[in-house]
Each structure stands twice: as structure tokens, then as C-alpha cells.
Amino acid sequence: MRFYIKTFGCQMNENDSETMAGLLMKEGFTPASAPEEADVVIINTCAVRRKSEEKAYSELGQMLKIKRKRKLVVGVAGCVAEKEREKLLERGADFVLGTRAVLKVTEAVKRALQGEKVALFEDHLDEYTHELPRIRSSKHHAWVTIIFGCDRFCTYCIVPYTRGREKSRPMEDILEEVRELAKQGYREVTFLGQNVDAYGKDLKDGSSLAKLLEEASKIEGIERIWFLTSYPTDFSDELIEVIARNPKVAKSVHLPVQSGSNRILKLMNRSYTKEEYLALLERIRSKVPDVAISSDIIVGFPTETEEDFMETIDLVEKAQFERLNLAIYSPRKGTVAWKHYKDEVPYEEKVRRMQFLMNLQKRINRKLNERYKGKTVRVIVEAQAKNGLFYGRDIRNKIIAFEGEEWMIGRFADVKIEKITAGPLYGKVVWIEETPSPVSTDK
């Protein structure tokens, strides 16, 4: 029997899909390269925005078209599954897996193959350990989920309702997973969490993200460690110190701000002000001068005025982000904002505001990227792009493209930057690691 998993959304969904694939292969299922070749299709969904939910339903519709022509089991997992539950069975799905029930994927598939309609939502995260089989999408970089859920309850966000409350994995279990990855030749890991900075608070044993980064950096063979996604008020001075002094910890911080207006931040239930956020950036940069800080912003939140938007523009100009993810506000059913705030900003105005910020960020990117011209940076070669060039990222998460060969993938390379754009940088390889082995990760 062959299976195919289509994944939408965040890196945690990607990690969940890797785990589901590993569990299915352990039971004798084999992966298919396309849904047309599969006996079982699983759609791992995202519900963070209306558009992502619509993509999930569109994909379900496409799979049901195939199902009408031949025998096919179709399952839905992820945040849309958790949110819509049994409604998806009514829409034609054969099984539904909640976000904390992905470890029961083989049970769901086997029961569905017998003709049963299956909906599993029970929390099985206590069974989530380093011993789980996983089919990783990369041979040198691995996602490692360290904390599930979120306790922040931002008024626009569906995640606390679909992913549940915060639940940290024991530190030793995470470290054992990283040790196994190192033995398998993995060189980079990214620690994942909806609020990764909250790691360890619920364990009550002194565990923290800062301590985890320090311990993981001692594991031989692991050269770079990343973490996603941070919440400003949970970003500790201890964490800043670790980033500053530990050469294996990436000099890259993703720190969503969402708005520059204090009034809007309060309506969003973000527990900081614009001034406090900018002060945090200053603290980070004072200790880590070469850090690359990226962020997320929502435009068109209910009641956002032109004055509020100007405050956001001011924040972006002062923050000088290396990257900025922009989203138009879309109400998510069940959230506080959906219940209590009228979505009254015209769509055309939301688009105008987003376009303005996109253009502003492009100018900032271009200016910041000029610093790279003529410099030589160290990257891990990741893959070949559609244009034929290869690419990698430096320790600040800057994408560098260059001419290369397939054997280079997974190795360190020094690239001299020759061309600057507002996006990727382009350069020439001046050194390539002969065989993958522990080397300095920064340059």
C-alpha cells in the first residue's frame, strides 16, 4: 500500500508529516511521489489564515475527484482537522486526525482501509519521543519540535484552539533526538514551537530554551542550531547571552511584532508596547551586533486607522528588519477578534497598506544587503534551485545563490558575494569542504 502526504502551513506541520510518514513506513506502507499513485492520501492542513484553510478544502476536493474514479482513502490532519473535526467526514474525508493525535495515523489509516469513518482527537503527546520513526525531508537539516501549543491567546489567532496549551518535551528526550541526528550525519537542527521561548516553563525543573541551546551545542557533529518562533516578552536576557557567546547558535531571530500601534497591540492581546519591543531589539543588538532580526506584521486589523498604520511604518523604519512577513487580517472563527471586533477595514485599503510595507521592506533589504558586497560568507549548501543555481544560508539566515554541483549539498562552502539584490545574494564559491566534518560555522 502506498501513501502520499500533502503538507500546508508551518514547520511544525512539516515535522508532523515527517513523523506520520515514518510511522506509516514502519508498518509496511511505502511513499508515493504523487497522489495519483497512492492508495492513501493525507492532507496535513493549516488554519492560521482563511486562505490556508481554503487551500485545504480545495485539496480535499481534488482528492475526492480521484476517489470517485478509483479506490482511495483520504485523510485530513493538522489545524483544520482539529478545528472542523467530524464536519470533514461529512465533506467526504475517510479519517480525521487532530493535532495531538498524529501519532495514531497508522490506526486511522488501517481502520479507514476497512471502510470505517474515523475521527481521532485524543492527546497522545506523552508518546512523542526521540524513538519515533521519522522520514526527514533533508539529509543535513532536521526540524525538532520542543514545545507544543500556545498559552498566549492573541485575539486574532486560532492556534491555541487548534494546537492546545503549551506542553514541553523533557530536555533529555530532545537531546537524545539531536544525538541520534548527529550520528546520522545531520549538521543543523531547528528547534520548533508556536512559542519556542516558553520552552521548559511548564516542566518546573529549570529547563529553558537557553539551557537547551547550550546543551545541544555540545553534541559533536551538530554545527548550527536555529529556533522558531519567538514571543517578545518571553525573550530572556539569558537567551540573548547564549546567542551572543555560542558560535553554533544562529545569529538569526524571528520575533513577530504584528503592529506598531500600541492601541492595536492591546486589542490583539500582545503583552508589550511598541517602545518595549524596540527596546528589546536594542538589547539584542547590543549583545549580538551582527544579528539578523525578522518579523511578522498583520495589516488591516479591526479598527486600524491611518494613524495606527503610520505607527507601524515608523516601527518598521526603526527596527530595520532583515525580513518581514506580511499578512492581511482575516477573521478566524472562534477567536476573540472574530467574536467581538468588526472586520471593518476595506479590503482595498488592507492591500494598499500591505503593498506600502512590502515596498518599504524591499528598500530596507537592499540597503542592508549592501553590507555583504565583496564579503566572503560561510554557508551550508542546501539544494539546487529551479534556475539551476545552488543555494545555502549563512549563520544569519541570508540566502546565497551560486554555481555548484550536486555533490556539494550538505557541505560547508565559503562564498564571495558578487551581486546584491533586495532578496537573495549571488556569489562565487571560493572554498568547499572536501568531506563533511566539524568545522567553524561562521565567517
Curated annotation (Swiss-Prot):
All residue ranges annotated as the MTTase N-terminal domain in the record: 1-114
Enzyme class: transferase
Record-listed [4Fe-4S] cluster 1 binding positions: 10, 46, 79
Catalytic activities: N(6)-dimethylallyladenosine(37) in tRNA + (sulfur carrier)-SH + AH2 + 2 S-adenosyl-L-methionine = 2-methylsulfanyl-N(6)-dimethylallyladenosine(37) in tRNA + (sulfur carrier)-H + 5'-deoxyadenosine + L-methionine + A + S-adenosyl-L-homocysteine + 2 H(+)
GO function term, MF aspect, one: N6-isopentenyladenosine methylthiotransferase activity
Domain (Radical SAM core): residue spans on this chain: 136-367
Keyword Cytoplasm among record annotations: yes
Keyword terms, alphabetized: 4Fe-4S, Cytoplasm, Iron, Iron-sulfur, Metal-binding, S-adenosyl-L-methionine, Transferase, tRNA processing
Tree of life domain: Bacteria
Pfam short name (any one): Radical_SAM
Binding site for [4Fe-4S] cluster 2: 150, 154, 157
EC number of this enzyme: 2.8.4.3
GO cellular component, one term: cytosol
Family in the record: Belongs to the methylthiotransferase family. MiaB subfamily.
Subunit structure: Monomer.
Functional summary from the UniProt entry: Catalyzes the methylthiolation of N6-(dimethylallyl)adenosine (i(6)A), leading to the formation of 2-methylthio-N6-(dimethylallyl)adenosine (ms(2)i(6)A) at position 37 in tRNAs that read codons beginning with uridine.
Protein's name in the database: tRNA-2-methylthio-N(6)-dimethylallyladenosine synthase
Species of the source: Thermotoga petrophila (strain ATCC BAA-488 / DSM 13995 / JCM 10881 / RKU-1)
